A protein has these predicted regions:
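Extracytoplasmic thiol/disulfide redox context detector
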Residues: 16-97, 128-162
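Short Fe-S-cluster ligation motifs
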Residues: 96-107
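Sec-dependent signal peptide recognition
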Residues: 2-10
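Short, low-complexity, polar/charged sequence segments that are solvent-exposed and flexible
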Residues: 76-79, 105-109
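Sec-dependent N-terminal signal peptides of Gram-positive bacterial secreted proteins and lipoproteins
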Residues: 10-16
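Short, internal strand/loop/helix patches
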Residues: 106-134
Length: 167
């Protein structure tokens, strides 16, 4: 009986180590041929940092620790800003309940500065609870595209390299 229980335990441990390494979420990213027209349709709402030839579209949440690390890394690196043009879109991770904060960022006179204050400096700001129809339209347009692209984590990135031959 002891031998059988040891064999079962060994089998259990082996199976959990093999199957435990499988990713929990196995989603395919939308191909760029599908994603790029959708991203271009909301580009007017992007907060842009950098001036490089390679464009990086990023969906971020203002409270998400990974998004904050990513934005801080870019803001603090002139080299990254020379290599890439970053197009940031705020898209709420529902567990953080940041829709009002996102609206506050987009409603700011200088959204880039507000973004840095919240995400890089990690300062508290007064969060608005009502927004103009234009801000609501921006947030909804970004959410619609994010849902079509099945964005499920933050930051979620699309990289568009410059075409060879200057085209």
């Amino acid at each position: 009986m002891r031998k059988i229980s040891r064999i079962l335990l060994l089998f259990f441990l082996l199976s959990t180590s093999i199957f435990g390494n499988e990713p929990l979420i196995t989603k395919e990213k939308a191909p760029l041929s599908v994603a790029l027209p959708l991203l271009k349709s909301i580009d007017q709402y992007a907060i842009i940092i950098g001036s490089g030839p390679t464009h990086m579209y990023a969906f971020i949440d203002p409270v998400c620790p990974r998004s904050r690390e990513f934005v801080s890394m870019i803001v603090e690196s002139a080299k990254m800003q020379e290599r890439y043009t970053y197009h940031f879109f705020y898209y709420e991770l529902t567990r953080f309940h940041t829709k009002n904060m996102i609206g506050t960022i987009y409603n700011a006179t200088r959204p880039l500065e507000m973004m840095k204050t919240i995400m890089v400096d990690e300062k508290e700001v007064s969060v608005m609870t009502t927004f103009s129809s234009d801000i609501t339209k921006e947030i909804n347009a970004i959410s619609d595209v994010a849902e079509k692209l099945d964005i499920y984590k933050r930051p979620y990135l699309f990289v568009v390299k410059p075409q060879k031959g200057g085209q």
